[in-house]
Each structure stands twice: as C-alpha cells, then as structure tokens.
Amino acid sequence: MCIRDSLIVDRGDKREFCAGSIAKIFEEIGGKVIYFGKPYSPVYNLSAKISNKKVLCIGDNMNTDIKGANNQKFDNLLITSGIHKNELNIGSIDKLEEKYGVKVNYIQTKLKW
C-alpha cells in the first residue's frame, strides 16, 4: 500500500525521493501496489464525510494535490514554494496548468500554521 503517490518531496533545501518512487519501481518488477491518498478518491471521500462544509485541498504537487482536487471538483490552493518552484515565475501558472492538465484555483507562496 502506498499512501503518498508523490515521486519526490522537498524537505527544507533537500529534494528526496518519496514513497511513490518506491511503489513505481515495485510495479515495474511485477508487484501490485494499492494506492491511497492524493490524487485517489477514497481520501477525498473521507474528507467530504468529515465535514459537510466546503473543502479546500492544499498542496505543492500538480500531479497529486491539484489533480486530486480537480478530480473531486474541490477548490485547491497551490503552494508555490514546493516542488514546482523552479518551474514557476510571474505569469507561468497558466503554462504549468497546461503542462500538467490541471486547474489551480488559488496560489500562495508558503503555508504557515
């Protein structure tokens, strides 16, 4: 079971392989992987059951976070300081959306609790 489909993740200044990379290799050698998490619908269905209010999906990955939100028709917030930071500059959100086949609703540089 793979609960994080992302291939890479940024941890501070370091870019590291994520669980999705291991799952992909396992599939390539014939293994069966069950995915749970973004962008797959079970995690979003669970979110919708928890609250009947509007859901906002927040993340930095176009392939998982934003794609999953789009698939479920939920609003999303792209954190631009994440894994796509080197692909982004002023006015490039449209190009990034086209490249990944997704639609971003809101953007923010960082998320701080």
Question: What do the predicted segments below correspond to?
Answer:
Residues 4-113:
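Asp-based, Mg2+/Mn2+-dependent phosphohydrolase catalytic module
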